[in-house]
Amino acid sequence: RNIRCLAIAGFFATGTTWGVTQWANLYMVKQLGVTAIYAGQVMSVFGTAALIAKPTIGILSDILPIKKNHLAALVMFLFAPALIVFASTSNPNMLFITGPILGIGAFMHSALTNALVVQSAAPHLRGTTAGFVNLFNQIGALLAPLLLGNVLVMTGSYQMSLMSIAIAPVIGACALFFIRLK
């Protein structure tokens, strides 16, 4: 059951992470009218925040008296409002605030879910289990940009495209509450 829940969480959260990462530049350039260089700078700050967030949440998960699956769920829940705030940003200067917040939300969960995969798998099946869960992560990463593109075609709005996928990490977070850790 734990592995199925992690696969579901990964499908939704990792799919959203890569869907957003692939579409954020277009949103900034096409919807907000910033230059590609400006959008690239915002995404560099997004990436830097994500880079710092992963080891930070790993350290916090070792220190805080909270189960890793609950902490991962909390982080996934926070990803949704971070995405909505980013997609609602109309002032390009604010992207340097909302971009890193989104970077943290988009990538922080994976450090915890990776640890949960190892913790949930039988020692002799850890590689197989990691491969299985990552298969669903990749399927999510494949389908999320397609979903965003379809919403864009239907609505003509990059903002609506990004907001449409904000529910996905919430679904992933809900799946994590069904994990039973020993």
Cite the ranges covered by each PLM segment.
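Intracellular juxtamembrane helix-capping segments at the cytosolic ends
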Residues: 108-121
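A late C-terminal transmembrane helix in Major Facilitator Superfamily
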Residues: 118-157
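Structural signature of the two symmetry-related core transmembrane helices
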Residues: 69-84
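Helix-loop junctions at membrane interfaces in 12-TM secondary transporters
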Residues: 87-98
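Helix-to-loop junctions at the C-terminal end of transmembrane segments
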Residues: 54-66, 152-153
